[in-house]
Amino acid sequence: MPSTLLWGAAGGIGKALTQQLTASGHAVVAVSRHPAEMKALTPHVIAADVSQPPQVSAAARMAAGMGAPFDLFLYAAGDIASLKTAETPPADWNRILTANLTGAFLTAQASLPHLKADARLVFIGAVHERLRLPGLAAYAAAKAGLEAFAEVLRKETRLPVLVIRPGAVDTPFWKKVPFSMPKHALSPQALAEKILTALEEDKTGLLDIP
């Protein structure tokens, strides 16, 4: 049975991925700030905040005892805010960068010792070129940085790395931005299905999912 270490599991996309992965036969260790929301989806749940290095390290060690070595590392944590640069408190800037970029670094670093030699790493990114809009400086910068980090990580580890760049997805993110959700927005479940298909097809690099 393949095993997956999923960070940011309680978000809309994270939950959908947990459901799809378990349905496809994966043993999923789900790490989340809200573990109670995940217990109905997988028996292997760990509480941790990806912005806190000690919690990330402890969670990775706990996860190792539940399913290591892992076949798949998946980072689905993220956050967004709509704040113009001149009005952005440094704490909010740091929060968005941490959720989308620094957390990816922290969790990948802590997880690498517990991955199989041929493991895959997947990060949930964004089509950031289309998000360079007033109020989204932190989010767009973080997602652009995530792609650069993922590329370097691939070169360092020589493992297959995939950055998923979804279009609009129907999640609570839309409540945090002053835009209307497009009518063509994917459901988290539909996105998760497409991600699993990409994994089955051994996709790597950047993958746009409109």
What are these regions (language model features)?
Residues 10, 14-18:
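N-terminal Rossmann NAD(P)H-binding glycine-rich loop of SDR-like oxidoreductase domains
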Residues 42-54:
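Rossmann-fold cofactor-recognition segment
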Residues 76-82:
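Conserved NAD(P)H cofactor-binding loop of Rossmann-fold oxidoreductase domains
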Residues 108, 142:
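Active-site helix of classical SDR
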Residues 131-137:
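Active-site loop immediately N-terminal to the catalytic Tyr-X3-Lys motif
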